[in-house]
Amino acid sequence: KKRRKKMARLIFDYPFIGREYRLEKETTMIGRAPENDLSIPDYSMFRKMTLLEQRTYLSSLKNVSRIHARITVRGGQYFIEDIGTSGQGSNYGTFINEIRLEAKKPYPLSDNDHLRFGPIETVFMAE
């Protein structure tokens, strides 16, 4: 019987991003720029919203840096790091359980940690 590989993921609850993002890569770049592995918003979903709906979320979304954070996995342990577009940390911060992370320092993630990229919230599920 094949064992399913454990797969950490982020769970979102917004109309402009998929409900679940699987952390399949060793390094996942997160931010507002569409080139990121995980872009906030998911532009394919965002484009389908009405202009009024888009405008409703724009003020929150502009507080997510173009390159905001990075999640890496080493030896089965996941880490999150606040990067920022210039590499000096994001303007509106990355948070674990409401604690703001120091820029450019990897923090270990635990199952059910509540993460925030600026105002955008998600939950980290270890598997």
Predicted region positions:
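Buried hydrophobic-core signal for structured, non-transmembrane domains
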Residues: 69-71
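C-terminal boundary/linker segments immediately following FHA domains
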Residues: 2-12, 27-31, 73, 79-86, ...
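Intrinsically disordered, low-complexity acidic Ser/Thr-rich regulatory segments
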Residues: 1-62, 74, 123, 127
